[in-house]
Amino acid sequence: MEKIPNDRTVYVYCYSGQTASQTVFLLHLAGKQAINVSGGFDKGISGEEAAKELMTTEAAAFGEETYTVDADIQTAVENYYKAVAAEKDYAKNNISPKQLKELMDAGSEDICIVDLRSEEDYAAGHIEGAINLPYGKGMEENFDILPTDKTLILQCYSGQTASQTTAALRVKGYRAYNLSGGMGAEGGSGWLGAGYTLVK
């Protein structure tokens, strides 16, 4: 963490943008200027013709300079990733649409689905039983409506903003997971891509 610059923008990517989004939140927590690359490598970077000219198989190295990180935040970030590594049920804090549907079909009362999309999109159709907590500035003021005795399944449009929120809630002690692919689209990924229905 101390090798990541504080004085310039850091762009973070993974395969889809979802685990990178968790990392972006943690970097923000540490005071770093981090931005998630939307769509990650698979659906973002690799599709850009100009990016292909910049790709290499050689690993980049960190510079020699180090940057101060608050000790408590450093510990929180280390504990976060230890928990990710120890997670047995849902890898990298992601739950698949199929896994969520199985929990719903089993009548699980131990989960709370949280839809982070806009009020308008939520009203137009949402996963059955989901509550609406639109993603955006000030949303943390409403975290107290979220149950602390249930597993939170967070869902947005693509899984990226839900991943950032997953990280924020886990740091605060919630058991939270991102719905992989988010709401998605028919014929694509996410809840709709898996062929599951919505309610109004």
What is the role of each PLM region?
Residues 12-14, 155-156:
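Short, surface-exposed ligand- or partner-binding patches at beta-edge/loop junctions that are enriched
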Residues 115, 156, 180:
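Active-site proximal loops enriched in glycine and acidic residues that flank catalytic Cys/His/Asp
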Residues 120:
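Conserved alpha-helical interface elements of two-component signaling phosphotransfer modules
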